[in-house]
């Protein structure tokens, strides 16, 4: 049997969506799900992803 892996599913949420006063395409918060290796990446994940509500690339941070 295979061992349980060190990969966990994490959720990334946009940091600019709640504080931004820019015009929006629609209401809501942009969230992505991805996997990360807990052994190699112990700190919180931070990626630049596309936010469809703001219609631009924004920083998405890992949430619990």
Swiss-Prot record:
An annotated GO cellular component: cytoplasm
Pfam families attached here? Ribosomal_L33
Q: Please identify the protein, giving its name as recorded.
A: Large ribosomal subunit protein bL33
Q: Which family does this protein fall into?
A: Belongs to the bacterial ribosomal protein bL33 family.
PANTHER family named in the record: 50S RIBOSOMAL PROTEIN L33, CHLOROPLASTIC, LARGE RIBOSOMAL SUBUNIT PROTEIN BL33C
Keyword list, A-Z: Ribonucleoprotein, Ribosomal protein
Traced from the root, the source organism's taxonomic lineage reads: Bacteria, Bacillati, Cyanobacteriota, Cyanophyceae, Synechococcales
Recall the GO molecular function terms of this protein's record: structural constituent of ribosome
Q: Which organism is it from?
A: Prochlorococcus marinus subsp. pastoris (strain CCMP1986 / NIES-2087 / MED4)
Concerning HAMAP family, the annotation shows: Ribosomal_bL33 (MF_00294)
Q: Does the keyword Metal-binding apply?
A: no
């Amino acid at each position: 049997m295979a061992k349980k892996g060190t990969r966990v599913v994490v959720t990334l949420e946009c940091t600019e969506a709640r504080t931004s006063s820019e015009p929006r395409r629609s209401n809501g918060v942009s969230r992505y799900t991805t996997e990360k290796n807990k052994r190699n990446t112990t700190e919180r994940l931070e990626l630049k992803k596309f936010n469809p509500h703001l219609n631009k690339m924004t920083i998405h941070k890992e949430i619990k």
